Amino acid sequence: MGTYGNIPVGVFTGIPEINIPFFEVTAGNYTLPISASYHLANVRPFPTPGVLGLAWNLEAGGHITRTVRGFPDEKKDSQGHAYGFLEHHSEMNGISSRSSFVSALSTMFETFMDNTGHNEYELMSDEYSFCFCGHSGRFYLDESGNWVVVSDEDIKVLFSMSDNTVNLSQLEQSGRLSTVWWTNKSQNDRFITGFTLVTPDGCRYDFGGLEATEFSIPYYNRANSNLVATTWHLSKITTSEGREITLSYKYKGNNDRTLLMCDLRYSPQSMQYGYYNSNNGTMSDGAYQLNIGWNGFMGFLLFPSYLSVITTPNETVRLSYRPDATYANRLLQENYAIHALYWSETTVTASRFGDFIPANQFLMFMDGVNGDGTQTEIRQRIAARMSDMRLDTITVCSMRGGGWKKVITSFSNLARRHLTSLTFSDGFHSHHYSFKYNAGEMSYYYPMAATDSWGYSTGDSVIISETPTFQLVPSSQQALTRETLSEITYPTGGKTCFEYELNTYSKRASYSATHLISSNGVAGGLRVSRITNRRGDGSIDNIRRFFYCENISDSASTLAASSGVLSQLPMHTRNILSSDRNFLAIIKSKDAFSVPVTADDTPVVGYSSVIEQTIGSDGSSLGWVRRRFSNFDTDIYGQAHPDTQPVYRLVMSDSSQISPVTSLSYERGKITSEEFFDATGNLARKTCHRYGHTSGNAIPSIHHEESFYHTYGGMGTAYLQTGCMTSTHVRRYFETSVEDTVTTPSGRYSTKTSKTYKVSKLPKSVTVKGSDSKDRSEAYTYAYERAPTWGGAYTIMAEKHILTPLESVTRLVGSQTRDMETAAYSVTAGGVPYTSSCSLYQDSQRTIGKEHYKVLSTDGYGNPLEVVADSLVSLLAWSYQGQRLIARADNIPLGTAMQHVQWLTGLSSRDPVPSDYEAIIQLRASFPNALFHIYHYDGWLCPLSVTVPNGHTTYYKHDNWGRLLEEYYYDADGARHVLNQYDYHYAY
């Protein structure tokens, strides 16, 4: 079950990286882990907790999520007019100067001013973020219509308009959701339903399908809004050998109605605008609107889907859920939040910045909700129609009668449910994790929680009758600490305890992204300050303390000593002046305005220097480590890493300076040095890391905004347009060298490792220079690189995006080649690549050397059936869909496998039966000089027995979790002898 208590911390952000492994499911050599992770930054009022409770996330598969920029990329109306970037990306071609940029925006803007023919379009690609199975990144559509990926890996995006989109009729007929009473259908007639991503090992990951696609629509003004596909869950994994893992989802409740949720919050705003006299600073012929009360609510109606079944060649995983019985109640509060769900048109005529919100829009998409009766009755029906699901159990069943195992969850009864325990059981044994949280609660009613300027709880509830100050709301440590994870108790009885403190900073990035401002304060949530590990008897094992400064002695000083850099100070007011200085709009918001930046992973606060001190059980220091990171400020190599200004601008004067930038967040948060000090403060070791950019061109990203302001005094309507073109960097910032220096009483010893990379972001070379000053290097060539000249299997590998297999490794000492190891590849009849031979040479021209491994035949999965290794001929018998070797015979006559190829290939594609083992025994008798190993497996494909060439058999017993319980054998008289027994004792 792993090592308990060793909780890593992402010290650049101060966030503990907490993960509880559940189990792994497999398909051949592919492993899909299932676990629960906890993220401290997600302890906030919005949105509602996930299926594992507040701040916990179920890690099982993955997803692609979309940030819509302007129109959804695929937006198309029932008359066939496409609004989105998907069919207008070519409008960006030819933008090579500011004048051509302004011209492109002006042409586009004209379609907004005269939309009688519905000719509007946009120049902004949506942003698609993916996170699955250890892979993460983003992708965008570029001006050529290609999907461009921003990731540390070379990941390929596949999308087909015919296979990955549906129209409104198909969406309705599928039963995925009900569009009852929706009046904006004609403007929404195309929806993206999925993508396929291919990783460098050739694995294909399919996302979406209607059951695995989540949708959303603004909760208010639903009548005139777009229905948007926002999330595509992982639905199938296909390995390069053709094995599949399928993931199924549920989107309907027990009443066979589409599951609905809402994410509502109170976010009042105000707007004042009019014609501006720059001589005296006055406004005229304008208007003022304050959106408080009912008009201050914002949010979305959500159409979620939940992972229900995972099927592999070996296991079936079933996830069961139950509705949170108190969810509806937390959406209702008399006189306040209750009005966030519904109000009647006769009660209030609501409009927000000129958009009329009819009362009957509240029933759109609400199949099964009766609109008759009192307002209170209708609100209660709407609340009851919402469902917030929580995970109850995850059960894994073996496909081969190996039994079952499950994880059972327990939750608190607080307003925002907390995961309190995980029980692991297989019907015979069980063990538990338990979790405790800091005391106190956020507001019970979801829409009414008050937040600071970073979205964290202040501990109060909003008062909707008040006019906000629209100013910075500071963070409160007491409020932020409430409901945070304080303790994990492991199955052994040991514990890990967490203490937190507010994030601090001594510098902040300017809004223009050109420089840093000396300014200190607290901001943006919590960081871990201390982690205490306790033994089962409660005594302290060790303590880890974290200091976010340059020296431990600085930790007790003022905020100015903090190494934190604030990415931006939240801005609550925008003063927007037209370029001719004749029109002014002043917009204020309780929630801070966000800067539209693509490919941005900047934390609220990042730390340039963090010290981690370890304290032993006796309270004495065991030493500490100081880690430095690249950040906005200057790193140890004199290099700063700020964002950069837009390439082109067409903007109004914005005194708040909120403007898009080109993000360089991919350069920040890289560890630049680690210094290890002993208990007395002496430096024992120092490791320095340098980085460089990989190849890859930036893609242009346009941000534009069109604003229409209705004025008075006969002045008509003011039209304002703003836009910027920034760059989205595809290149990455990889480690190019590591210099490690160890200090001992006899002197210092240094080793330097240098690295280069391919265009595919795979390693190109690694060079190590030791204390003897000699370079020892390895240079790598990959099979896909041989495709243009060698064709055949290499072309197939390149086409399937199988990039990682090596074709050659050349080892050098200085400039002299020491040896070269090569691999050749072929493909099966079904197109599965496999290693067909390996050779070792003493020169780079491949003239001096020999082939030392050759595959003579394979099964359909590319597993070798007959190989020659250093003149030794071996036969290999595979089974269980090519996942397990059930027999190996060494020193057999050449061609033996070919004589039995039909049986061997058939055996590989199915599970073995007793007659298969009988055939192996007969084969062993036919070749008395051969050395046979025979393997049996249990229902979980764990080893059951191993028979070695002398006929001795060792037996193994595992539990359903794959833990070895016993090793034993039988003697010639049939007596059973135990070799080893293993007991797993847990405290509870």
Model-derived regions: residue spans:
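Long, intrinsically disordered, low-complexity, charged/polar and glycine-rich segments
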Residues: 1-233, 239-242, 264-271, 276-301, ...
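Extracellular structured ligand-interaction cores
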Residues: 15-19, 31, 124-127, 136, ...
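Outer-membrane beta-barrel pore domains and translocons
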Residues: 37-39, 250-252, 503, 783, ...
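Beta-strand elements of repeat-based all-beta scaffolds
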Residues: 196-197, 234-237, 307-311, 422, ...
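Ser/Thr/Pro-rich, low-complexity mucin-like regions
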Residues: 211, 241, 311-323, 397-407, ...
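Short, solvent-exposed beta-strand-terminating loops
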Residues: 252-259, 324, 440-448, 886-900, ...
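Short, flexible helix-coil linker/hinge segments at the edges of structured domains or between repeats
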Residues: 253-286, 324-336
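Beta-propeller domains
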Residues: 303-305, 314-468, 480-483, 693-697, ...
